[in-house]
């Protein structure tokens, strides 16, 4: 599972997930990409689950890039614990996603195979996504 090796602070404030993705919105490495259309959060488990679906479908052909990393800790208090007594411990890690963010990239496979693989991966994610191709200028 993806998570930072070390952080400056153990816990973070909730914060807001506003705006559009300015960085990481272009296809940089591969030929085809899966791009987020909606905003939300991706947990480390969801990122890994979609990655497995991708790699299983393309088998040994092609190279895959994961363009998101879960770097925000989400804390949770245990069940049946009264309010107060401080903030809960870190339960899992998420990546905050804005519309336009490229999530996965792939190269070395046909467009048809890439579309099928990304459709399987998108089914594992809680966001609306779209298939994009690299534009050569």
UniProtKB/Swiss-Prot annotation:
Gene3D superfamilies: Ribosomal protein L10e/L16. GO terms for molecular function: rRNA binding; structural constituent of ribosome; tRNA binding. GO terms for biological process: translation. Pfam families: Ribosomal_L16. GO terms for cellular component: cytosolic large ribosomal subunit. The keyword tRNA-binding applies. SUPFAM superfamilies: Ribosomal protein L16p/L10e (SSF54686). Part of the 50S ribosomal subunit. Belongs to the universal ribosomal protein uL16 family. Binds 23S rRNA and is also seen to make contacts with the A and possibly P site tRNAs. This is Large ribosomal subunit protein uL16. The lineage of its organism: Bacteria, Pseudomonadati, Pseudomonadota, Gammaproteobacteria, Pseudomonadales. The gene is rplP.
């Amino acid at each position: 599972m993806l998570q930072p090796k070390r952080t400056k602070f153990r816990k973070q404030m909730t914060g807001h997930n506003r705006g559009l993705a300015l960085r990481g919105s272009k296809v940089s490495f591969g030929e085809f990409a899966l791009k987020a259309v909606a905003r939300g959060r991706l947990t480390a488990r969801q990122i890994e689950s979609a990655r497995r679906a991708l790699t299983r479908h393309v088998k040994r052909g092609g190279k895959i890039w994961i363009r998101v990393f879960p770097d925000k800790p989400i804390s949770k208090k245990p069940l049946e614990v009264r309010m107060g007594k401080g903030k809960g411990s870190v339960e899992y890690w998420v990546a905050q996603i804005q519309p336009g963010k490229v999530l996965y990239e792939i190269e070395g496979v046909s467009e048809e195979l890439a579309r099928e693989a990304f459709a399987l991966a998108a089914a594992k994610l809680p966001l609306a996504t779209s298939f994009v191709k690299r534009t050569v200028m």
